Amino acid sequence: WDRHGVPVEYEIDKALGITGVKDIHDMGIRKYNKECRKIVLRYTKEWEAVVKRMGRWIDFRNGYRTMDRSFMESIWHIFKMLYEKGSVYRGHRVMPYSTACSTPLSNFEANQNYKDVSDPSILVAFPLRKPFKGYSLSLVAWTTTPWTLPSHMAILVNQSFIYAIFRLKSAFFIMQRDRVNVYFKDAVVISEVKGHELLHLEHDQPFMYYNHYREKGFFRVYHADFVSEIDGTGVVHCSPGFGEDDYKAMTMPGLIKENELLPSPLDENGRFNEEVPEYKGMHVKDADQSIIKDLGKKILYEGKVYHRYPFCWRSDTPLIYKLVPNWFVRVKREIPRLLESNSTINWIPESIGEHKFKNWLSEARDWSISRNRFWGTPIPLWHCDGKYICIGSIEELSRLSGRKIDDIHRENVDDVVICKDGEKYRRIEEVFDCWFESGCMPYAQRHWPFECDNLCLPADFVAEGVDQTRGWFYTMHVISTVLLAKPRFRNCIVNGIVLASDKKKMSKRLKNYPDPMDVINRYSADSLRLYLISSPVVMAENMCFSEEGVGEVLKTLLIPWYNCIYFYSECPNAGDQEQTRMDDWILNTLNTFGNKVKRDMSKYMLQGVMGYATSFVNDLSNWYIRLN
């Protein structure tokens, strides 16, 4: 049972009307976590009822819960092992950030929920401070995030592009040559320059914030490879506190060092703070139109862009990218070992391992594992003046602090102080990302190494949805490879997503799917199981659920099979007769059927079973019984 993390907190925040971290601190972490604890077991009985009725085997009696002390202690032990291997570090990175949940997300979380949306598309004029080529010019930059303009720090161009100086009415501007007529049909091109000629030119910022950065080399033109001539203007407004590419671009000329903080004038809820007083308290998305209005004549074009954009997988709200401090597991340096381990896994279908998972591993980044939240396993790091003590067990914390420790949620360990060499060490505030907990599950479910020293590594078999190639499969694979240099599992069946009959995601709000229990009670659990196991979903392909399809299984396979059983019950002495050639034929057919099933099952290939069974029952019912 996964019981921690943002999903639980988000439900509590909605129920209690909590709008930010301040509300939680005012309420008290102890009381807040008590509320979280109340709801995590809410649907346990309903879940057990459906699973048991489906005939799916799950060991409910010995199930693990991520909120249990034993599970959390194993996570501490695993983290300490990673920490002592030098596989953990703290850094400042531009991360996907959920303003609704007030926490950064990992890159694979951000990739889970993309939507087609429209955003503002504007062209902004940035006047150069000195004449260029004899003209008083303005650079024309394109952006779809007007809210980042108050924290503008530089202009980026591509030094290999050709740029055009053009006149628009009585003013002069410069942008990539081939993009001028896309936006300005009446523009008059005067001359052309190479991109490298624009480098280091000073320009005015759109808002007069952070002007003291000018003496450090900001508010100038720099090169970036990612600047495109396919869309936009070939001129990019750079806000390194809110863009990963922007941040990297500022490290190239040495303006900033890696992990250095830069202007990021937002609070944890995505609202402007006192650094930008004109928009203080406004959420970034709400501020777009106000910023466009205040820029006035600096806006040369205003329209809409339709594109795919990441949303928070839990709150379903747009993510932003924000420079935040975070704790990371070093994954990038482990890519060769991750790929080697992956090559030993039998993936079903094979293409998932050879392409989807392999490609994801090849581009893996260091893994953000800390969250600025409350209901989760606390990261066991105590710090003092840049020095850290990493704790790997409850006994170790009790021994070093002199306090008896029972539960290790935040409300019980945040005030624990470790005194060493006359200095007081206090715990950092972050908790683990719940995906880190999921990756630790194979060890923590057994309370390894405290009550169990057998890791059962690698596991024989694992199964989950195709989305877990960037989730659970990935986190288990990373932790096992980095920690123990072995793959976590031998065989992996990857299923697709079951969609509603209208091809949309199943939604309680839309009521676009039948109650599973109603389907089972109407057609039988076997009908539903056989329908699913014979569908494309067991080969990692999506499928649209059809209640009629379940009924068809009942009609074509199970009812004929039940009729066969009924027939034999009416002929109790049939086996006493001498064996005929028809008997030999049906026994041979049965043997062939069994061999096909064994062959496919040994390879974890499930999809053919329904076809084999239907064919055999047809032979049994329509030929053997009728003609014998």
Curated annotation (Swiss-Prot):
<dbReference type="GO" id="GO:0006428">
    <property type="term" value="P:isoleucyl-tRNA aminoacylation"/>
</dbReference>
<dbReference type="InterPro" id="IPR002300">
    <property type="entry name" value="aa-tRNA-synth_Ia"/>
</dbReference>
<keyword id="KW-0436">Ligase</keyword>
<dbReference type="GO" id="GO:0002161">
    <property type="term" value="F:aminoacyl-tRNA deacylase activity"/>
</dbReference>
<dbReference type="InterPro" id="IPR009080">
    <property type="entry name" value="tRNAsynth_Ia_anticodon-bd"/>
</dbReference>
<dbReference type="GO" id="GO:0004822">
    <property type="term" value="F:isoleucine-tRNA ligase activity"/>
</dbReference>
<dbReference type="InterPro" id="IPR002301">
    <property type="entry name" value="Ile-tRNA-ligase"/>
</dbReference>
<keyword id="KW-0067">ATP-binding</keyword>
<dbReference type="InterPro" id="IPR023586">
    <property type="entry name" value="Ile-tRNA-ligase_type2"/>
</dbReference>
<comment type="similarity">
    <text>Belongs to the class-I aminoacyl-tRNA synthetase family.</text>
</comment>
<feature type="binding site">
    <location>
        <position position="508"/>
    </location>
    <ligand>
        <name>ATP</name>
    </ligand>
</feature>
<dbReference type="Pfam" id="PF00133">
    <property type="entry name" value="tRNA-synt_1"/>
</dbReference>
<dbReference type="GO" id="GO:0005524">
    <property type="term" value="F:ATP binding"/>
</dbReference>
<feature type="short sequence motif" description="'KMSKS' region">
    <location>
        <begin position="505"/>
        <end position="509"/>
    </location>
</feature>
<dbReference type="InterPro" id="IPR009008">
    <property type="entry name" value="Val/Leu/Ile-tRNA-synth_edit"/>
</dbReference>
<keyword id="KW-0648">Protein biosynthesis</keyword>
<keyword id="KW-0547">Nucleotide-binding</keyword>
<protein>
    <recommendedName>
        <fullName>Isoleucine--tRNA ligase</fullName>
        <ecNumber>6.1.1.5</ecNumber>
    </recommendedName>
</protein>
<dbReference type="InterPro" id="IPR014729">
    <property type="entry name" value="Rossmann-like_a/b/a_fold"/>
</dbReference>
<keyword id="KW-0030">Aminoacyl-tRNA synthetase</keyword>
